[in-house]
């Protein structure tokens, strides 16, 4: 849901013309992330326990209205969840997602494509092994304050409930139903931001998937903008003065758990890309 919202809210902007070297493009991406993550925090939880207004969250009219809140010349002063069709009253909680996840994208000789993300939450999960499998400690993905201002939190702890996850394995198709791109990532709450950035870089900026994944990634937590401190983040770090001029007053440069990979269809075959920040590789067998 978050990736669909991030991308769709930006449709009225010409990201292709702006390009990857323009601070305005990254500003727009950050603003769209703010809106999408506000909705995610308020409305997304285990659908067996809470009413998730999925159709309303990705409705074209709702997306259009949310996207119109974004300005190319300034930041939004305050961002809160919207009121999509079918949404019950909700308040955002506070979660503590941990970036210990794995993802792979694969294609076989017949063109069948898979995007798979798996997680045990923390490093080695719960520290327990059963039948050769590491058991997870996914309880830490819940919001531990169950009620805010008298309103139940969608991702609150309940017996037998699945916690909200950031896992976002994604396959992108063209208008004829052919696969263009498969991409996913590890990195806890940064996953939707990594995936959205990679899709924009391939589709709008015409980057090879390897270059798209290697581009800097920014993550937004409320009003705080996080820029990675790795060498890959240097081009984005150089844009900080311009981003501050657009109203992003709280910017932090720090290490972030970015580990994306993907495959894209090219003339005559497929091309892979793996995050240079991680131990992953692109490999043909």
Name what the model sees in each region:
Residues 8-11, 185-207:
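Alpha-helical support elements that line or immediately flank enzyme active sites
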Residues 12-119, 128, 253-254:
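Internal maturation/activation junctions in enzymes
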Residues 81-92, 147-157, 245-247:
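Short Pro/Gly-enriched beta-strand edge/turn motifs at strand-loop
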Residues 108-110, 173-177, 265-269:
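Short acidic-glycine loop/turn motifs at beta-strand connectors
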Residues 112-176, 181, 205, 209:
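Active-site rim segments in enzyme catalytic domains, especially the processed small/beta chain
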């Amino acid at each position: 849901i978050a990736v669909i919202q991030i991308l769709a809210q930006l449709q009225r902007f010409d990201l292709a013309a702006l390009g990857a070297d323009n601070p305005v493009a990254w500003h727009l991406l950050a603003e769209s992330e703010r809106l999408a993550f506000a909705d995610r925090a308020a409305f997304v939880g285990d659908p067996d326990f809470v009413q998730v207004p999925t159709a309303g969250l990705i409705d074209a009219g709702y997306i259009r209205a949310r996207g119109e809140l974004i300005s190319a010349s300034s930041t939004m002063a305050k961002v809160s969840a919207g009121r999509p069709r079918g949404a019950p009253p909700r308040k955002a909680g506070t979660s503590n997602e941990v970036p210990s996840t794995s993802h792979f994208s694969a294609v076989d000789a017949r063109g069948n494509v898979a995007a798979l993300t798996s997680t045990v939450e923390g490093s080695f999960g719960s520290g327990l092994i059963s039948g050769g499998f590491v058991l997870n400690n996914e309880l830490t993905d819940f919001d531990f304050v169950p009620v805010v201002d008298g309103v139940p939190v969608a991702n609150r702890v309940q017996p037998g409930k699945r916690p909200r996850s950031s896992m976002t394995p994604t396959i992108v198709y063209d208008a004829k139903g052919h696969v263009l791109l498969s991409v996913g990532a590890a990195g806890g709450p940064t996953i939707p931001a990594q995936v959205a950035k990679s899709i924009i870089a391939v589709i709008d900026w015409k980057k090879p998937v390897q270059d798209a994944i290697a581009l800097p990634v920014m993550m937004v937590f409320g009003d705080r903008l996080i820029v990675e401190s790795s060498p890959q983040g240097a081009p984005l770090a150089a844009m900080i003065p311009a981003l501050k001029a657009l109203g992003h007053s709280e910017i932090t440069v720090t290490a972030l758990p970015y580990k994306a990979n993907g495959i894209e269809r090219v003339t005559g075959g497929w091309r892979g890309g793996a995050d240079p920040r991680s131990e992953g590789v692109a490999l043909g067998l």
